[in-house]
């Protein structure tokens, strides 16, 4: 269900599902508002998308609530968007449970001011089945929540359980190993506030060479919150987390 260039959008009690399992040939998106404002997604179920089950892109003033995303590559994705609240959702058995991304070379960028709270984010360990070349193809299986190059993000009161790579990852665009030539693009995450979440398990079987190396070096599971350590020159770590 794609909605483009619209205002005052409500998607309520809608189900999208590819019934053949996790296949690269499945459609990319279940629910897909883009370049829109004042969006409410409520009571939605999205299953089996080869990109994102619930995707909101290049939009502003967004609520995603009371919904369930499972067996997608990305369960719920907020991309190049501002002022999003994502709450009271279940993201389970996806490759990555919830993604908050900002990407280059798009008409709208500068993703910021998203809150993710009161969600259940568990067992997001499905092998990545995105078509070759898709940006979500870089997401490791076992990613609970991934923040990529987004600013002013608050993560609180969520339950994270048994996401095998890491429960929360904060990364720059450089982790994708993809070049970009957009002079206005900021590839670094900043001002990420994480508090009052619960964690159980996770980080025990990472699907990423850097995370595997970290796990081996520590001889312990990956910590619940992982930052890739990159930041804009002149910034301090206290300005990131």
Regions inferred by a protein language model and the residue ranges of each:
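Extracellular beta-strand/beta-solenoid scaffold signature
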Residues: 1-2, 23-33, 48-55, 71-78, ...
């Amino acid at each position: 269900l794609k909605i483009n260039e619209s205002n005052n959008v409500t998607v309520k009690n809608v189900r999208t599902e590819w019934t053949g399992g996790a296949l690269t040939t499945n459609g990319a998106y279940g629910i897909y508002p883009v370049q829109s404002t004042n969006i409410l997604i409520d009571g939605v179920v999205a299953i089996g998308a080869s990109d994102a089950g619930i995707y909101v892109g290049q939009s502003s003033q967004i609520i995603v609530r009371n919904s369930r995303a499972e067996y997608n590559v990305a369960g719920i994705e907020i991309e190049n968007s501002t002022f999003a609240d994502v709450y009271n959702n279940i993201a389970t058995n996806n490759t990555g449970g919830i993604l908050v991304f900002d990407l280059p070379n798009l008409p709208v960028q500068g993703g910021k001011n998203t809150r993710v709270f009161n969600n259940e984010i568990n067992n997001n360990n499905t092998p990545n089945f995105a078509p070759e070349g898709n940006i979500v193809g870089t997401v490791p299986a076992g990613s609970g929540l991934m923040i990529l190059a987004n600013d002013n993000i608050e993560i609180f009161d969520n339950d994270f359980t048994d996401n095998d790579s890491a429960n929360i990852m904060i990364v720059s665009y450089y982790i994708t190993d993809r070049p970009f030539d957009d002079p206005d693009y900021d590839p670094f995450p900043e001002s990420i506030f994480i508090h009052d979440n619960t964690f159980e398990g996770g980080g025990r079987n990472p699907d990423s060479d850097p995370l595997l190396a970290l796990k081996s070096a520590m001889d312990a599971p990956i910590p619940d919150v992982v930052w890739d350590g990159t930041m804009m020159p002149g910034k301090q770590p206290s300005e990131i987390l």
